[in-house]
Amino acid sequence: MRSMIRMTLAAAALGLAVPALAQNAPMVGGAPMMANKTIVENASKANNLTTLVAAVKEAGLVDTLSSKGPFTVFAPTNAAFEKLPAGTVDKLMKPDMKADLKKVLTYHVVAGKLDAKELMAKAKMGGESANLKTVEGATLTVKMDGDKLALIDGKGGGAFVTQPDVDQSNGVVHVIDSVLMPKM
């Protein structure tokens, strides 16, 4: 009887602890981002990253971004994709454009886990900016713009980090406000 009471109390305590843990997790797109989940698992729950998740699936990158990593992902929001010229997303999502889509997406990924503090330190050490080698193979420039982290792509376009340091089991995500475009 005592063991039954202990088990009931333990289950009740766990039931109270799980929502408390979720409340401490950073929220992205209305969903808690759990540090014990992968980049893909967490992004799939965020209602402001649905275009990114659809693109990751279309490009065949789910397994890669679910693997051990670690990765630093600069994750453009749905609004970021909407800033692209009309028809760009639809064009990239076509099966015959898979290689270009993969190139764009992997341009948003850096090997290793780089939090905002490390990115800022790299920019300061580089005398205002630093180059990051992306998984795509090209470089992305990170710099400080006031108190914000800014990214400059291969075409001179830029994005600001709007939500830094969203820890994942296989890296870190920094939510950004524009899609970065490599030279194609």
Predicted regions and their residues:
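Bacterial N-terminal signal peptides that target proteins for export
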Residues: 1-9
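Mature, structured domains of secreted/extracytosolic soluble proteins
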Residues: 6, 21-184
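N-terminal signal peptide c-region/cleavage motif recognized by signal peptidases
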Residues: 17-19
